[in-house]
Amino acid sequence: MAKKNERIVETRLGRLTLPEERVLQFPRGLIGFGDQREFTLIQVREDSPFLVLQSLDNPSLGLLVADPYSFMTEYEVVIGEADRRLLGIDSREQATVLVTVTIPQGMPERTTLNLSGPIVVNNEARVGLQIPQTDSRYPAHYTPGMATPKKS
């Protein structure tokens, strides 16, 4: 049974007991999932760079995500003033940046990161936004290890 400040959440990874402080609010939802507003991050394995951004309302909705800086150093996320206000941050350094990951079944060598739609989370306020990027250097299907064009 869940304690007062805990939730029991069904996921594809099994049932989890989740403290309220692990709940992330996404006021605009995510692209394609605008009605999903509450998520949590679940570590896939201790030695893995991957997490699951799990919807708390839909057990079948869990997106594989990762810190893009684990795969590349040159990645500049632009966060507009309105988004910074909604997140409650003054600069990008106050937030965690994540990108969705696609690993085709049986073909891990074809893994791609979506650099054009990063997910930015203020861990302290527990608020997240998906913030589409307009910089064409950052594709929706970036293969880790592939060179990214430098800013001109």
Swiss-Prot record:
Superkingdom: Bacteria
Transmembrane segments annotated in the record for this chain: none
This protein's UniProt keywords: Bacterial flagellum biogenesis, Chaperone, Cytoplasm, Translation regulation
Classification via SUPFAM superfamilies: BH3618-like
One cellular-component annotation, GO: cytoplasm
InterPro entries for this protein: Flagellar_assembly_factor_FliW, Flagellar_assmbl_FliW_dom_sf
Keyword Chaperone found: yes
Protein name per the record: Flagellar assembly factor FliW
GO biological process terms, semicolon-separated: bacterial-type flagellum assembly; regulation of translation
Places the protein is found: Cytoplasm
Function comment: Acts as an anti-CsrA protein, binds CsrA and prevents it from repressing translation of its target genes, one of which is flagellin. Binds to flagellin and participates in the assembly of the flagellum.
Subunit record text: Interacts with translational regulator CsrA and flagellin(s).
Family: Belongs to the FliW family.
Highest classification ranks of the organism: Bacteria, Pseudomonadati, Thermodesulfobacteriota, Desulfovibrionia, Desulfovibrionales
Predominant subcellular localization, coarse grouping: cytoplasm
A Pfam match: FliW
Keyword Cytoplasm among record annotations: yes
